């Protein structure tokens, strides 16, 4: 029970010392270590085998004790007395002295939790044989910041301070109880942390594979396995370790060893004097100078990539080294970037002298090296001399220049640019050539169309401004080479077109012999149409007549092959595959000189069969989407405005609405379509206005005749009805007699009359026949008048017998 109480008091004292450690570390500015009188010094054997070291570390750790905190035995005992007032203070001293004696004789390693200072620094832990509680101990000012263990192994020049004489940066690990504890290289190698002092003290590494060469100075070994320590001075080893998170500050004359556990362990009796620590300041200054000397030649990438810098004094040289390395690389990169574009241009040696060190002129050089080689060499060499603002203007020049100037007149362009300022010269020269492309093409065309001998004169002015030949050579490569903003067309004739249309011929004329029979595209089209495709024809107006596109300006014919497929892509519903298959197969002439005064150009193109009726209707409609669509470009839109809708898109159709082989006279298919009023043939839509008026008149006459016939029949029927009604009105008096005679009363009347006649005759029979007969008549009249007083007399007029 008494021993348990001592253990509890020890725990309380350890906790108080750990809490008081940050303030103590903050106050101490340099390492001052005092040894109490209860220290029992013991030398550790440096030749302890690795097996013994590893076996010694396998023992269970005793009670943890705080590390490298500035405290005294009196302070610890006083704090323990405050916490345990009922205990005797002398028992604590006896406990510590007994515990020190027991732990001194035992070689069991001891591990403890790290005690961090206010600056976030921690002492390294290790395995030591003696555990000594100093009366006043403070950590050295070279305490390093805690870093991960992985940081010790990733540095190439890292050296361990586990066996050196200063505090090294520990790696943070987790103890068995889950509490964080500091571990140095000795925790990973399980070796003895102390070494025996001799006249030439040598601190060995913590890994059994480490080979130590004889030396007169203390050498600090690294933590990496199979590391050979070469003879070196203390300042050199310290300088190398300053680069890595683990910092070692060694002194060959000092015999005091600060173990990884933070407990001071003397290695020799001669090293316990205080003046030894007075030389630590001098040693640190020498370390700083050595670090500065060593780091400058070793300013490599690992120096800048180390995340944790251990010694504050060594931080500045490391930053300087990293800054020096970056400054050294930056000029190299800048020189490469500046030199690269300049050397790529072969015409720059006289120009690169004033702008060799300028980085602002490099981007303009880049932009111009990609554009200006397409122009003349004189342009590229002179343009680079200008300022960056002026270079921007010169980069816009090759958009219209590259295909025109170098191909025709390079010598002429250079004299215009050299004597004048560079930006105005290309800007004034190139637009002049560009804008003069149309006037030479149009002006000669107006005067030279009537004859064919003027076509050479048209070619000569086109060659002079060096624009027309350029567009002719590049027509198959780029769309903008023909004309950027308009379609090449021929100006209309004044009055020849109107006079020729009034005299249509009765027989087709023969095409002129100087015109080609067909115009094929530059690339041969060998793909079949397919079952869903068909051929259509698109005729053009006088602006693109066949003579103009063949003999006078071939570029006008080339633009039909280029822009007509684009204009046909307007229709909604076409798939991408169908749009790709839209192409102009050929351009053929259609002889319309008798009707229109020129030979019509007809383009034969491919088109899906399913959309043929819609396209046919759109071509006939002036305001359809075929003419109004601009989504495929203004050039394609302008080309559709030159389509002649009077000629059907059905292949072979002519201006008269007949196939090309039928001619303009009667016969063949010509007698079928126009004369059939209800004809649904394809040629019915091409009927003339007179034919359509005739058909409408016939239809109207038929309807009128039918209406008149109906009205006449109605009148006749009505008159017949009225006549019949009048006839019935005249015989309406006999109607009651018919009613009377149609029934039994008539018979009865007849019978009664007969009876009366018999009666009267029988009565008056004897008097004579005549009288009886007369009596019979009078009696009948009397009987009729008596019995049928309401019936009129004319009954007997129609039928003397009285029957119907």
From Swiss-Prot:
Residues 46-90, 105-220, 345-516, 658-689, 724-748, 762-804 are annotated as: Disordered. One of its GO terms (molecular function) is osmosensor activity. Glycans are attached at residues 45, 157, 298, 308, 357, 393, 427, 433, 629, 638, 669, 683, 686. Induction: Expression is significantly reduced when PMK1 or MST12 are disrupted. The chain crosses the membrane at residues 695-715. It is found in: Cell membrane; Vacuole membrane. Residues 716-804 are cytoplasmic. One of its GO terms (biological process) is fungal-type cell wall organization. Residues 660-671 have a biased composition (Gly residues). Coiled coil: none annotated. Residues 46-58, 69-80, 128-143, 150-169, 189-202, 395-407, 427-476, 672-686, 774-787 have a biased composition (Low complexity). It comes from the Eukaryota. Residues 46-475 are annotated as: Serine/threonine rich region (STR). Residues 482-641 are annotated as: HKR11-MSB2 homology domain (HMH). One of its GO terms (cellular component) is site of polarized growth. The extracellular serine/threonine rich region (STR) and the HKR11-MSB2 homology domain (HMH) are essential for MBS2 function, whereas the C-terminal cytoplasmic tail is dispensable for appressorium formation and virulence. Belongs to the HKR1/MSB2 family. This is Cell surface sensor MSB2. It comes from Pyricularia oryzae (strain 70-15 / ATCC MYA-4617 / FGSC 8958). The gene is MSB2.
């Amino acid at each position: 029970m008494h021993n348990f109480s001592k253990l509890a008091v020890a725990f309380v004292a350890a906790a108080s010392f750990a809490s008081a450690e940050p303030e103590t570390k903050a106050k101490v500015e340099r390492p001052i270590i005092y040894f109490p009188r209860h220290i029992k010094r013991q030398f550790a054997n440096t030749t302890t085998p690795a097996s013994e070291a590893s076996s010694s570390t396998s023992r269970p750790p005793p009670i943890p004790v705080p590390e490298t905190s500035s405290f005294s035995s009196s302070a610890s005992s006083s704090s323990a007395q405050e916490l345990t007032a009922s205990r005797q203070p002398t028992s604590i001293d006896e406990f510590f002295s007994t515990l020190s004696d027991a732990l001194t004789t035992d070689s069991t390693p001891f591990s403890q939790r790290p005690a961090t200072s206010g600056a976030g620094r921690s002492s390294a832990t290790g395995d030591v044989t003696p555990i000594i509680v100093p009366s006043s101990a403070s950590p050295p000012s070279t305490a390093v910041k805690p870093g991960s263990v992985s940081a010790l192994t990733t540095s190439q020049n890292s050296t361990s301070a586990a066996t050196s004489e200063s505090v090294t940066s520990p790696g943070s690990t987790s103890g068995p109880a889950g509490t964080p504890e500091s571990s140095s290289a000795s925790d990973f190698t399980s070796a003895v942390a102390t070494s025996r002092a001799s006249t030439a003290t040598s601190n060995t590494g913590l890994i059994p594979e480490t080979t130590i060469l004889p030396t007169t100075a203390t050498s600090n070994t690294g933590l990496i396995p199979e590391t050979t320590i070469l003879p070196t001075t203390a300042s050199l080893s310290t300088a190398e370790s300053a680069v890595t998170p683990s910092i070692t500050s060694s002194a060959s004359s000092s015999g005091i060893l600060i173990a990884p556990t933070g407990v001071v362990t003397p290695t020799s009796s001669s090293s316990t004097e205080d003046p030894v620590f007075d030389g630590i300041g001098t040693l640190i200054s020498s370390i700083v100078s050595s670090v500065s000397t060593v780091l400058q030649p070793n300013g490599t990438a690992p120096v800048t990539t180390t995340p944790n810098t251990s010694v504050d004094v060594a931080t500045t040289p490391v930053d300087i080294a990293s800054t020096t390395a970056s400054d050294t690389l930056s000029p190299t990169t800048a020189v490469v970037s500046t030199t690269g574009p300049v050397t790529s241009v072969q015409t720059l040696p006289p120009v690169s002298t004033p702008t060799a060190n300028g980085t602002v002129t490099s981007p303009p050089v880049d932009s111009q090296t990609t554009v200006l080689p397409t122009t003349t060499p004189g342009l590229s060499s002179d343009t680079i001399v200008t300022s960056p603002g002026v270079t921007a203007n010169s980069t816009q020049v090759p958009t219209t220049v590259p295909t025109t100037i170098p191909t025709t007149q390079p010598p002429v362009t250079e004299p215009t640019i050299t004597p004048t300022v560079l930006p105005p010269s290309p800007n004034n020269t190139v637009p002049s050539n560009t804008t003069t492309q149309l006037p030479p093409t149009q002006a000669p065309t107006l005067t030279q169309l009537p004859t064919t001998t003027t076509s050479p004169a048209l070619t000569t002015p086109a060659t002079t401004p060096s624009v027309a030949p350029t567009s002719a050579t590049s027509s198959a490569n780029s769309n903008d080479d023909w004309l950027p903003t308009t379609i090449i067309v021929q100006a209309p004739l004044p009055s020849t077109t109107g006079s020729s249309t009034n005299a249509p011929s009765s027989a087709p004329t023969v095409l002129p012999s100087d015109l080609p029979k067909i115009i094929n595209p530059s690339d041969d089209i060998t793909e079949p149409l397919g079952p869903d495709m068909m051929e259509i024809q698109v005729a053009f107006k006088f602006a693109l007549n066949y003579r103009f596109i063949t003999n006078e300006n071939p570029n006008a014919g080339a633009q039909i092959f280029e822009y007509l497929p684009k204009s046909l892509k307007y229709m909604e519903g076409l798939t991408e595959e169908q749009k790709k298959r839209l192409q102009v197969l050929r351009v053929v002439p259609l002889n319309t000189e008798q009707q229109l005064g020129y030979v019509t150009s007809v383009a034969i193109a491919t088109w899906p069969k399913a959309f043929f009726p819609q396209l046919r209707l759109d071509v006939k409609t002036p305001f359809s989407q075929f003419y109004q669509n601009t989504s495929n470009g203004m050039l394609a839109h302008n080309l559709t405005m030159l389509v002649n809708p009077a000629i059907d898109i059905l292949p072979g159709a002519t201006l008269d609405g007949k196939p090309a082989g039928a001619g303009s006279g009667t016969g063949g298919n010509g007698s079928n379509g126009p004369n059939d009023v209800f004809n649904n043939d394809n040629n019915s839509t091409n009927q003339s206005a007179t034919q359509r008026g005739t058909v409408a008149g016939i239809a109207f006459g038929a309807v009128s005749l039918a209406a008149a016939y109906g009205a006449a029949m109605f009148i006749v029927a009505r008159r017949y009805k009225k006549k019949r009604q009048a006839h019935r009105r005249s015989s309406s008096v006999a109607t009651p007699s018919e009613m009377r005679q149609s029934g039994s009363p008539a018979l009865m009347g007849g019978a009664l009359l007969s009876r009366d006649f018999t009666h009267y005759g029988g009565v008056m029979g004897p008097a004579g026949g005549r009288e009886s007969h007369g009596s019979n008549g009078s009696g009948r009249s009397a009987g009729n008048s008596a019995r049928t007083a309401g019936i009129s007399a004319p009954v007997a007029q129609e039928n003397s017998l009285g029957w119907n």
